[in-house]
Curated annotation (Swiss-Prot):
Tissue: Expressed in retinal ganglion cells, photoreceptors, pigmented epithelium and fibroblasts (at protein level).
Protein species of origin: Homo sapiens (Human)
Gene (name only): SSBP1
Highest taxon listed in the record's lineage: Eukaryota
Biological role stated in the UniProt entry: Binds preferentially and cooperatively to pyrimidine rich single-stranded DNA (ss-DNA). In vitro, required to maintain the copy number of mitochondrial DNA (mtDNA) and plays a crucial role during mtDNA replication by stimulating the activity of the replisome components POLG and TWNK at the replication fork. Promotes the activity of the gamma complex polymerase POLG, largely by organizing the template DNA and eliminating secondary structures to favor ss-DNA conformations that facilitate POLG activity. In addition it is able to promote the 5'-3' unwinding activity of the mtDNA helicase TWNK.
Domain SSB: 30-141
Modified residues annotated as N6-succinyllysine in this record: 122
Protein name: Single-stranded DNA-binding protein, mitochondrial
């Protein structure tokens, strides 16, 4: 019953050696990022002449773990690592909503893709930048309500 649909799906993801030269255009790939964290700064809206405007902000995610050699897992010291992500929002509707409603300290969930690029800094030195391009943002907290 499910054999035929499963084979159809697998054919989309599997490339045979003999098809290498003819099916490169049809090959599927995946670039998805899911982040849950707190906004580190209020967003800024930037527009470079001749390019689409973009809303940019930073997002912190935390990884926590217990360390120690104790057999009782709960007795170890808690360690934490914070990772900062640069978020860019290009989609017109989402870009405007993010600029207006994303605030420093807000807890959000976002989906997007990772992008690696290069730019020239003020000293004309080539730098690499990693950016998360957001496709969807879900607001999990309202900063104004949390402050009350």
């Amino acid at each position: 019953m499910f054999r035929r649909p499963v084979l159809q799906v697998l054919r989309q993801f599997v490339r045979h050696e003999s098809e290498t030269t003819t099916s490169l255009v049809l090959e599927r790939s995946l670039n998805r990022v899911h982040l849950l964290g707190r906004v580190g700064q209020d967003p800024v809206l930037r527009q470079v002449e001749g390019k689409n405007p973009v809303t940019i902000f930073s997002l912190a995610t935390n990884e926590m773990w217990r360390s120690g050699d104790s057999e009782v897992y709960q007795l170890g010291d808690v360690s934490q690592k914070t990772t900062w992500h640069r978020i860019s929002v290009f989609r017109p509707g989402l870009r405007d909503v993010a600029y207006q409603y994303v605030k420093k300290g807000s807890r959000i969930y976002l989906e997007g893709k990772i992008d690696y690029g290069e730019y020239m800094d003020k000293n004309n030195v080539r730098r690499q930048a990693t950016t998360i391009i957001a496709d969807n943002i879900i607001f999990l907290s309202d900063q104004t309500k949390e402050k009350e």
